[in-house]
């Protein structure tokens, strides 16, 4: 349907003088981004003010123009903050909406603001400014989660639990050591976040549409005013680059993968089949039919939202893969995946930073589980090696002992010394197994024996926590 009589066209687009008829109503709605790019409003104003100050310094616009622009922008900011700004679909996006209102308020000075600038470099600047602020917020929230993990790990540096491989009981570890594994993951995430921030903190403004501008602009002045570390080196790349958005979504995907792994374990541990932890009611929900249920909805949703963030990354990669230089309208589609990834990561981290300190640990259940499944079998093999037996022979001997215990429905620690020697097939070499072996076969002895950097011994866990706090 044609929109020639539509009220949305009462305001002409900034480019409409070239065309003989107004944009079709459906096309107008299809191409407008004002429905989602309003969140750029404050950074758009900041970028415009820095640009205007530079134009005045370079005598491209007058001091009076600058004063008028500053006054008008102050009013626009107040209107937006008060929810009184009238966004116009016909003006397409946040940039033209603000510029139109500015011109309405201050006249010709508003029309001069866009001198030496294109929406191409303007939106690229807004996107970086907005993402930088979001990255800084996420970095703080991620730090809060890391602190929460350190604090909980410190409380449970000596709490014994089973370590698993293939989701089968493998060896005894401490819960603090287990939590510190996630601290390491999230620390790598924090490092990646800092790296990508440093990489994209360059100013695109000044690239104009794609080739730069004929005006004697000072890009370094604008970069300094907006807190950028420098300017983009190539005008074509400046307006068409979305690597930073892709890189953020890659960071977000890896971080959410870590969150998802933690979530999966929280879900398992909360299950009565494990019974290792409990979560506060405020992080769980019930069932509409089963009155006994307490469901771990937060970790389940975090696990599910991980796929959503993966999708945001794939959307951006696909968006960019076939674009020739420089800017194309395709790039309008970069925002919603990025916004979604930022929002999902921030919300997830906030909830987990609040939830982790309130995890109730059921230490007795953890230790009991660690005492099952022959978790100290490797310790027995190591003991035999230290007595002079080759490791493969020791491995085979302990495997025989485990098989014997399975047949008798008992644990290694239930055997007497002579029974243990016989079960290992070493009754003809009694010197290889002495009474001291039973200390090593306890889960406490097993954990305490891992006395090296990165090991699960409580002293080593506390040392790792100390290093972690120093690195925050």
From Swiss-Prot:
Q: What class of enzyme is it?
A: lyase
Q: Cite the annotated pathway.
A: Amino-acid biosynthesis; L-arginine biosynthesis; L-arginine from L-ornithine and carbamoyl phosphate: step 3/3
Give the reaction(s) catalysed.
Answer: 2-(N(omega)-L-arginino)succinate = fumarate + L-arginine
Q: Which InterPro entries match?
A: Arg_succ_lyase_C (IPR029419), Argininosuccinate_lyase (IPR009049), Fumarase/histidase_N (IPR024083), Fumarate_lyase_CS (IPR020557), Fumarate_lyase_fam (IPR000362), Fumarate_lyase_N (IPR022761), L-Aspartase-like (IPR008948)
Highest taxon of source = Bacteria
Q: Where is it localised? A: Cytoplasm
- Which Gene3D superfamilies has this protein been placed in? Fumarase/aspartase (C-terminal domain), Fumarase/aspartase (Central domain), Fumarase/aspartase (N-terminal domain)
One Gene Ontology term of the molecular function aspect: argininosuccinate lyase activity
Q: Could you give a single Gene Ontology term from the biological process aspect?
A: arginine biosynthetic process via ornithine
What Enzyme Commission number(s) apply to this enzyme? Answer: 4.3.2.1
Keyword list, A-Z: Amino-acid biosynthesis, Arginine biosynthesis, Cytoplasm, Lyase
Q: Which coarse location class applies to the principal site listed for this UniProt protein?
A: cytoplasm
GO CC terms in record:
cytosol
| Entry's family note | Belongs to the lyase 1 family. Argininosuccinate lyase subfamily.
Q: What is this protein called?
A: Argininosuccinate lyase
- Biological source species: Polynucleobacter necessarius subsp. necessarius (strain STIR1)
